[in-house]
Structure formats: structure tokens, C-alpha cells
């Protein structure tokens, strides 16, 4: 089984269209290993600060929405012609592989967050993501609300000014961000995604942290 790579203080930034991400390492970067795997798990996890977004199911998607399960967060937009639908499809395969490895569906959730709130509305986003998997979640928010979360995860985005034809470009991260059941930023998955590899790497992380949600009451 592929081992989960652990590196020191990593922040990933991926830009749509180029499909690459840049890795910053801490002063201990000399001890970091090569990068053979898609999933990078952080040795020290940073707790996320409060944020508020909007979803179609409960009306509010916030920090509490990430508690008690592992969350896989992908930022994009519905008008995205390639990276977003491809990544969501890949994540549906990743989920299937995870379940096949014995990971409980109730312990994981996949969240697509639109960074194009001018065109993408919560109800539309939810219908869009459910095309890939009925359990996938969708959310969005104002630019300020989105920035509050994306800055915490190191997931830059930029939308061009709106036009009269409502056609414009949106630049966003192509990575998937992993948050643990305590609401801590736990890792990053960089493309290209090989479903079986990502699932196997996460299975190690998952089993090493089984029962983590119990600490919520501490």
C-alpha cells in the first residue's frame, strides 16, 4: 500500500489551466522526501477559523459543517469547461475506492465550493455536483466570505470583471484540500488524481486517526 507522504509545513497552490501547484517548505525542508504521491499529509495541523458560506440544504455551510468527518474541498465554478468536471468525476472515483477499502461513507464528505458567486447559485451548484455523486455537497458565498476560507487553505482564486454577456474567466486552485474531523487543515491532494492511489494513501491516514472525532468533546 502506498505510504502517505509527510512533509514539513506545506502549502499548496494550484492554478486552473496550468494544472500545477507550488510547494513551500519550512526551514526543515532539507529533510523532506520526494513527492511520489498525490496526498500530502501535514505533520502539524492548523485549526481553521470560523467561516460562513451558503449551501442549498441547510442554508449555512460553516466550520461546524466540517466537524465529525473528513472533508475533501475543491474550489471551482460551474462554467469551468475542463478542470472542474474532470476533478469532480475523479473525486467520485476516489470516494468509490475509499468505500471499497472499508472507509465508512458517514466519515467522509466531498464539498465543491464555487468561487463564482455572480453566476453560480447554491441550488444550481447542488444539482450540478449531484450529477457526479448524489452525496456531494455544494456551497458558495460572497467574495469576502470565500476569501476568508481560501486564504486559510492557500487556495487562490480570481474572477475577471463581469461583462454584459456574463462571460468571463475565473482562475482557481486545482488541488483538493483535506480537513480532518476536528476542523483542522490536514493535507492537500494535488493533480493528476489516480483514484486508487489517493484512496490507499488516505486509508492509511484515516486508520491512523480513527476515533479522532471523539476529541470534539474534549
Which ranges hold each PLM region?
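N-terminal targeting signals for export/organelle localization
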Residues: 1-50, 208, 218
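Short, acidic, Ser/Thr-enriched surface-loop or helix-capping motifs
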Residues: 55-56, 180
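Short active-site neighborhood of thiol/selenol oxidoreductases, capturing the structured segment around
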Residues: 61-91
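Conserved helix-turn-beta segment immediately C-terminal to the redox Cys motif
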Residues: 88-112
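Thiol-based oxidoreductase modules, predominantly thioredoxin-like and allied folds used
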Residues: 103-120, 135-144
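Short, internal strand/loop/helix patches
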Residues: 126-173
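Thiol-/selenol-based redox modules, centered on thioredoxin-like
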Residues: 162-218
Amino acid at each position: 500500500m502506498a505510504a502517505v507522504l509527510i512533509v514539513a509545513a506545506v502549502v499548496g497552490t494550484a492554478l486552473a489551466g496550468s494544472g500545477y501547484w507550488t510547494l513551500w517548505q519550512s526551514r526543515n525542508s532539507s529533510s523532506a522526501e520526494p513527492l511520489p504521491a498525490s496526498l500530502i499529509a501535514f505533520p502539524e495541523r492548523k485549526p481553521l477559523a470560523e467561516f460562513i458560506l451558503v449551501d442549498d440544504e441547510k442554508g449555512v455551510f460553516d466550520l461546524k459543517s466540517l466537524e465529525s468527518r473528513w472533508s475533501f474541498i475543491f474550489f471551482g465554478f460551474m462554467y469551468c469547461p475542463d478542470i472542474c468536471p474532470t476533478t469532480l468525476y475523479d473525486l467520485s472515483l476516489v470516494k468509490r475506492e475509499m468505500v471499497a477499502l472499508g472507509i465508512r461513507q458517514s466519515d467522509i464528505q466531498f464539498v465543491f465550493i464555487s468561487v463564482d458567486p455572480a453566476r453560480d447559485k447554491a441550488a444550481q451548484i447542488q444539482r450540478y455536483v449531484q450529477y457526479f455523486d448524489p452525496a456531494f455537497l455544494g456551497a458558495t458565498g460572497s467574495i469576502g466570505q470565500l476569501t476568508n476560507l481560501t486564504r486559510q487553505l492557500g487556495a487562490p482564486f480570481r474572477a475577471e470583471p463581469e461583462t454584459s454577456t456574463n462571460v468571463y474567466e475565473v482562475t482557481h486552485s486545482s488541488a483538493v484540500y483535506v480537513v480532518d474531523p476536528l476542523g483542522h487543515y490536514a493535507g492537500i491532494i494535488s493533480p493528476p488524481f489516480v483514484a486508487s492511489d489517493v484512496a490507499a494513501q488516505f486509508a492509511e491516514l484515516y486508520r491512523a486517526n480513527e476515533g479522532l472525532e471523539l476529541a470534539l468533546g474534549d
